[in-house]
């Protein structure tokens, strides 16, 4: 949503074709199924910037060739040590780089909140009652979660 509102042409890399409808609703212009070799080959050299939001260790090597010369893959999720998994050849030959970024401070956060308010951008969440927290946790373990869970504090009995 944010990248689209900022005027970027947005492409979603996904392992699941089931995410296409939501991705388009959220502002993606293009979808690349990362498990499809033909789609990944067609995306070669297409991107100046990839923002990697995946919050667990995964192989980034298939994505490096999709970066243009001087392109950058930026991690915003903490993965820990990925060094044994990264091939430097595509980075050296394509002048590609890998970077990391954290959430901004108070001023940057307020700026983004103001931008979201001006553009009608809100988070997509799944509201749950506190009584359903164990079920939500089980769903999370099974990767049966579409959006972030948010606990309805009104359901908390004091």
Task: Tell me what each language-model feature is.
Residues 1:
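Conserved SAM-binding loop of SAM-dependent methyltransferases across substrates and taxa
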Residues 4-62:
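Adenosine-nucleotide cofactor-binding segment
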Residues 56-57, 79-81, 156:
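Short glycine-rich anion-binding loops that position phosphate/pyrophosphate groups of nucleotides
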Residues 67-69:
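Helix-to-beta-strand junctions that scaffold the AdoMet/dcAdoMet cofactor pocket
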Residues 71-73, 97:
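Short glycine-centered segments of the SAM/dcSAM-binding site in methyltransferase folds
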Residues 77-95, 106-114:
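Rossmann-fold NAD(P)-binding glycine/threonine-rich loop
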Residues 106-158:
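C-terminal hydrophobic helical "lid"/dimerization subdomain
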């Amino acid at each position: 949503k944010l990248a689209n509102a900022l005027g970027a042409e947005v492409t979603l890399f996904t392992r699941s074709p089931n995410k296409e409808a939501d991705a388009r609703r959220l502002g993606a212009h293009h979808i690349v199924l990362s498990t499809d070799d033909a789609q990944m080959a067609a995306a070669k050299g297409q991107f100046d910037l990839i923002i990697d939001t995946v919050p667990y260790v995964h192989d980034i090597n298939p994505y490096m060739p999709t970066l243009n010369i001087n392109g950058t893959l930026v991690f915003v999720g903490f993965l820990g040590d990925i060094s044994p998994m990264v091939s430097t050849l595509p980075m050296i030959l394509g002048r590609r780089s890998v970077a990391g970024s954290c959430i901004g401070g108070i001023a940057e956060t307020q700026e983004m909140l103001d931008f979201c308010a001006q553009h009608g951008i809100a988070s997509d969440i799944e509201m749950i009652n506190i009584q359903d927290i164990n079920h939500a946790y089980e769903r999370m373990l099974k990767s049966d979660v579409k959006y972030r869970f948010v606990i309805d504090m009104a359901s908390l009995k004091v």
